[in-house]
Amino acid sequence: MTKLSLLPLLALASAVLAKQDAFQAKCASFGHRIKLPNVHVNFVEYVPGGTNLTLPDNHVTCGASSQIVSADMCRVAMAVDTSKSSQITLEAWFPRNYTGRFLSTGNGGLSGCIQYYDLAYTAGLGFATVGANNGHNGTSGKPFYQHPEVIEDFAYRSIHTGVVVGKQLIKMFYSEGFDKSYYLGCSTGGRQGFKSIQKYPNDFDGVVAGAPAFNFVNLISWSIHFYSITGSNTSDTYLSPASWKVVHDEIVRQCDGIDGAKDGIIEDTDLCHPILETIICKPGASSTTNCITGTQAKTVRNVLSPFYGVNGTLLYPRMQPGSELFASSIMYNGQPFSYSTDWYRYVVYNNPNWDATKWTVEDAAVALAQNPYNIQTWDADISSFQKAGGKVLTYHGIQDQLISSDNSKLYYARVAETMGLGPEELDDFYRFFPVSGMAHCSGGDGAYGIGNGLRTYNGAEPENNVLMAMVQWVEKGVAPEFIRGAKFSNGVGSPVEYTRKHCKYPRRNVYKGPGNYSDENAWECV
């Protein structure tokens, strides 16, 4: 190759290098340009793709000391005052491969943890992304104690503040600004998405809200009420994990085939009403390896029953059957649920010594009457979001061990009744997809790989990815009729055993054949 023929290649390489240098230079100088009210820049740094980013300031309970970053990006770390006595820690990740889209991530549990894996996931897909710590650090609810401003940040203000600041920063960093804004969150993040829809209907064009923790105060009470059913691990009413496996196996035996296929997955728990007398030990049985006592059967029946208040009002629907194995070590472990204990101690009663083992349904009434900053997130009139042209896609794992998927069905019904809209009308802006075989936000026994994060990723195509399906809905008007899930052989990144199209509610999946249950085309939404 002659020197003359090399010139075009050298020119191209120089142009690419110049572009890279320009992006890095812009990032290096960006911190000095940020002059926004209440915003205090901690640092700005360029992070090359492939970096394993260390996170020394991440609280130890948040569980992440590092995060692999897949794309070149400019990282902006800030503190933003939300009142005279509160502030959020906020990060904005601006990728080189920017697609003109803004996105906010959410949080989980009671936590004040920036979800760096969601920042990495969405920035890698070309979104300019923000994530905040919800106004406090760590997974405990103790920072709420006698700090109403911190509770307000947690209830709604952290997300909205991050959106306002993030959109301003995008316009400063990218000359083209942004075209559309999106939200992605699960659990508490799902609740935050719906809180944005209800309170700030213009914040997002598209919201992907998974396993939402709305009906929040009653969820807190529902979660702690399991202890009053199971008792401690020395009680006759308590079931060990091994006993819960006996229960689970029997529930699957009775309900698995209702959908037409014996694949170990319950497609529609609305049709599953297990008869637990079948596994009560026979009189004089010398072993309880494959059976439970009558007292334990009553425990299971109560666990799988709706939760009612002091006046008989439904507070929270039943735990859906099929989640027993995942829930046994968390919800039915012979101890009051830790998040609920924290909420009652540090918010409801402002008493760090409150004894969670003494909880009664009267306490649930006190908590609901309090409902600070309307954290319930249970408003069913979302017409302002509809009129603003917003779209919401919500999904919920049918094996969810922390938040009953029946609660998402209940909210869907409330919206339909409040707004006077049937499924066809709701489809214009609100679509709900129950996901069989999915536990809480990820994991499970079935096809849970729907692309709602790094742990469920199976491609960026809209048909395989709920976030990109939302982008296609917002930007091209093509709404998802199903969301495809992947069943991994051993977690994300391992071979895919099969895929399944999860139906849009209120339709449900039925095996029609021909072919094996692993063939997604052998199933039909009815």
Swiss-Prot record:
GO CC term, one of those recorded: extracellular region
Segment forming the signal sequence: 1-18
The reaction(s) this protein catalyses: feruloyl-polysaccharide + H2O = ferulate + polysaccharide
Glycosylation positions in this chain: N52, N97, N137, N233, N311, N516
Alphabetized UniProt keyword annotations: Calcium, Carbohydrate metabolism, Disulfide bond, Glycoprotein, Hydrolase, Metal-binding, Polysaccharide degradation, Secreted, Serine esterase, Signal, Xylan degradation
Active site residues of this protein: S187 (acyl-ester intermediate), D400 (charge relay system), H440 (charge relay system)
Subcellular localization: Secreted
Top-rank lineage group of the source organism: Eukaryota
GO BP terms: xylan catabolic process
E.C. numbers: 3.1.1.73
Binding positions (Ca(2+)): D256, D259, A261, D263, I265
InterPro entries: AB_hydrolase_fold (IPR029058), Tannase/feruloyl_esterase (IPR011118)
Entry's Gene Ontology molecular function annotations: feruloyl esterase activity; metal ion binding
Alphabetized SUPFAM superfamilies for the sequence: alpha/beta-Hydrolases
Class of enzymatic activity (EC top level): hydrolase
Cystine bridges: C27-C74, C62-C113, C186-C441, C255-C272, C281-C291, C503-C525
Function, as annotated: Involved in degradation of plant cell walls. Hydrolyzes the feruloyl-arabinose ester bond in arabinoxylans as well as the feruloyl-galactose and feruloyl-arabinose ester bonds in pectin.
Protein family membership: Belongs to the tannase family.
UniProt name for this protein: Probable feruloyl esterase B-2
